[in-house]
From Swiss-Prot:
It comes from Escherichia coli O157:H7. GO terms for molecular function: DNA-binding transcription factor activity; transcription cis-regulatory region binding. SUPFAM superfamilies: Homeodomain-like (SSF46689). Induction: Expression can be activated by RpoS and repressed by CRP, H-NS and GadW, depending on the conditions. GO terms for cellular component: cytosol. This is HTH-type transcriptional regulator GadX.
């Protein structure tokens, strides 16, 4: 038997199916049941094609894509380690995700497709009140992740330490202390989030510099250019030109995609129709 730790598991029962918990308990499922579970609480010894292991890194990329109001980032009471959603129809994409998950040498496009399909499967559980608490219990996100989640859900907002602390249900002094323990600050994270978003809008979406500045919360275009140059070592226009010429930049668009910094993307199960 293989015990899985530090990840989550999505299992799909095409027929009657049994999962064994680490405490020896058996959980029985009917055909059409889609299961989301804390992988550290599950033992898997057969039917590998029936489950997809979702890594902590992938889950961490899914979290910031959720709407701010959906996240209760304070301490949660103990929640179930397993959730079930019964699907009225077959899930044709599940087999593809399972096959991609077994392949250790995915091409770049396949990696992105696998991630997108996993996000779609995860979104099936969004209406379950226990999903977010379970997700957070597994991830136990650090303060950096929590702050970035708040910022990225409204990147253009005039964020202050007090406002972010309010969203996280804590005092500004406590937030400042926790960020200091992680060797960062709210202002540093605000700049990082805005600069990553700016790069996406410039390189991938082709926005004008003025539009990028406004979209990222900068009222002054000249100040935005100043911050961008300090962060990336060149102006936004220079970055655009180098990208158009195929010259290497310090942070390429491809690397940003690989890191998953697409916080503005909507995630839904539209198209799966479960």
């Amino acid at each position: 038997m293989q015990s899985l730790h530090g990840n989550c598991l999505i299992a799909y029962a095409r027929h009657k199916y049994i999962l064994t918990m680490v405490n020896g308990e058996y959980r029985y499922f009917n055909g059409g049941d889609l299961v989301f579970a804390d992988a550290s609480q599950i033992r898997v010894d057969k039917c590998v094609e029936n489950f997809v292991l979702v890594s902590r890194d992938t889950l961490s990329l899914f979290l910031p894509m959720l709407k701010e109001e959906a996240l209760n980032l304070h301490a949660h009471k103990k929640v179930s380690s397993l959730l079930v959603h019964h699907c009225s129809r077959d899930i044709p994409v599940f087999q593809e995700v399972a096959q991609l998950s077994q392949n250790k040498n995915l091409r770049y496009a396949e990696m992105l497709r696998k991630r997108a399909l996993i996000f779609a499967l995860l979104s099936v559980f969004l209406e379950d009140d226990h999903f977010i608490p379970l997700l957070l219990n597994v991830l136990q996100p650090n303060m950096r992740t929590r702050v970035c989640t708040v910022i990225n859900n409204n990147i253009a907002h005039e964020w202050t330490l007090a406002r972010i602390a309010s969203e996280l249900l804590m005092s500004p002094s406590l937030l400042k202390k926790k960020l200091r323990e992680e060797e960062t600050s709210y202002s540093q994270l605000l700049t990082e989030c805005r600069m990553q978003r700016a790069l996406q809008l410039i390189v991938i979406h082709g926005f004008s510099i003025k539009r990028v500045a406004v979209s990222c919360g900068y009222h002054s275009v000249s100040y935005f250019i100043y911050v961008f140059r300090n962060y990336y070592g060149m102006t936004p226009t220079e970055y655009q030109e180098r990208s158009a010429q195929g010259l290497p930049n310090r942070d390429s668009a491809a690397s940003i995609v690989a890191q998953g910094n697409f916080y503005g993307t909507d995630c839904s199960a539209e198209g799966i129709r479960l």
